């Protein structure tokens, strides 16, 4: 046989044998996936681990077909079940039984005096886990929550050490509408800024009345449940978190430079018939001058460290941590330092007795500084920071040339404003298990807060006026709250389908607070400012208060076959804040849910995994009015009897023993939907929230003889909030083979707010500036609407002035034309109307998470639309009426016929009152913010094993990366009333973080 024939035969035999081998190994693998009851598991994922591109999902009967070879390992997974692996054998048919994932099924939501499985919720509750908080480079837990929960509106002041403003489902009252914060079961007014984000395990936000009614008279504004971390079974583990950051201002409004200001001044004074400054006759020669805003700002720095140790066994578990935060603000001399300590322990002393304790402690120092953003914007760019001799400069000379704004830099270095705070929140509880289905728990809680303010204003001699003596103000404050909760819990399942959980008990809480303050001056030695060294007593004062509350509460949770769910609660509160005849109130609620997907008639398909309808109604209350509003109060005063001055008691406010709780009645309907093997999860809620008996301050006649005629409360107001909210979580792509995963989370909230009625048809005016009010509370309108004149362009000629309604004697071309709304021929108070609404229509956010081979990328967008801002800063900095610097927008002011149709002329004194409160200063407050971008890398365990490190991760993050807005001020987050008073500038934060566990 020739070599060529031998070669061809060999190849043929080899191919034949290979084909036989292949045909023997490749199988058409048929299988069925069922649960422990024998029911088919629909939509379970089946993947061949040898080639993860080969996979399928089970059909409506739980069956599947997949090509596989003998020895291949198939991985079967489904939401709510533990992942199972099977090996392909000789036969291609197999039945796989999936076991329930106990951890998933038992995921608990904290709802007050207990927990409930997430799948059994009937009310509107949203949760944020520690995973959602871990990478946010912020000093305040509230900042980390912004945009994470639908229905929750959070405003960040940006100032180190300040709390955020948080509102849930709109403003339900014109009074205090902050939600109740409960930390580890203890209701507290401890600010979230005192908590260490690294110590938090989860935050549950109770939004509708069926969820919040368990807190009765304090649940009207929603409840924020904070749960700190606890130990778990296993050897002790050390966790270290470190974060280093730099911060810069996100945006600075452009101001006039020296040349621009001089030109403006010349124009303003000429239009008023006043002499201009000869030194500014040629403005261009002055150049840029001093940028005062940049003089008070710098690059802020922040460092944040946490070390924790946790572990335990079946008998005892522990968690202990310490943290340190040091933040230097972007405004010079502003800063915040905080030390935190957390200790949580659980001890199973006996089989039937368990003890637990939680300790949350913080000590902080807040340096508020003596800065003034307004002064920095008003100060003249023609002025130097210091004089030639090194002293602080200041305006000196003709006032309408140089103004009266004190040097904004000097006080930063000469004054001191510091607050020391100490916060202790702790509880200890004992839980007795009488039977598997019956437990009793008793908890004693203690909440102690002490804070001390120290403010020194030093004597100075820089212009325009000197302060000849140093003054020092100090105060000392303390507040102690005690809590004692006792309740039974019955939990049992009857005949496998009827699950019943009942909680009933009592709660007692009492508080006492006091404070003293004093101001001294006339210090004998310039460098010694202890009070003993002061010779002049400026003032001394003090106050104390107390309150108590007794409560009875009960809650019932019932479930039939996980199909029909019912929750009912009742709380009865008695509060010392109201008169003896009105101290007790009842706060019931009920909610139900129907899981349609559990019905036999519901189509079993891959599209819909779970669908649940919810509905609820409840009554809650609000008692945040102070401790003594129901009784008559007195002040001390003096009266002259003959030649003697006698100390007397003066009636301060009139008693109203009939006042009682603000009452909120709220209805909620909701839908929870899970689709495509739980790759798409949607939660939708719609609500109607009515506040009745709102506490309104009633004006009484001055002739009544009371010193204060504006703070007597009466139950007279009604407010309505209605809206809907949704949360959508999706897994857009998940390829186990190459490790790429893409998740998206969307939240959106729409809310409409309206005052239904006040105590009278007379509106309530608030927020005064320049002798006029900016906001108004009026029947039929949203809370805090802006109230003012309506601008209608610019007068271009004298003829236009003459043909319009009378405004002022000095009205001239270049002045603003205001609308004569009542057509009486005169522009006056009767022509003021609603000119804006600070309440947003929509809150929204979107988070995208990407994962690939140890890398992770998060992009978080957040924003609001439909709200407006009253730019009160513009009254002074665009008013063009004084020797204050102006924003660069005044370059486009009216200087002659047709030169402007919106920006008026500059004229000293503003004879036409162009800067009166009008829609000229109302701006669109909508914004879209790239809130956070984080890029992280988790090191492979194989690399860490040699160093005995369990896990390690490094990340880079940018907070407030980009803001898209039409608002002209520093930032559109100006406060809940929508007025920009020159807020502390928001900062952009770049941070480097490191987390490791061993």
What positions do the PLM features span?
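Glycine-rich, aromatic-lined ligand/substrate-binding cores of catalytic
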Residues: 838-870
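Extracytoplasmic gating/loop element in the C-terminal half of outer-membrane beta-barrel translocons
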Residues: 280-281, 293, 464, 575, ...
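Conserved small-residue
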Residues: 239-287, 714, 733-838
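Short, small/polar-rich motifs associated with maturation and membrane association
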Residues: 1-342, 347-349, 354-362, 425, ...
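Extracellular/periplasmic, surface-exposed regions of secreted and cell-surface proteins
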Residues: 23, 133, 178, 300-303, ...
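Acidic, glycine-rich flexible loop segments
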Residues: 271-288, 302-306, 373-409, 414-416
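C-terminal extracellular loops and terminal segments
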Residues: 142-146, 711-720, 764-786, 835-847, ...
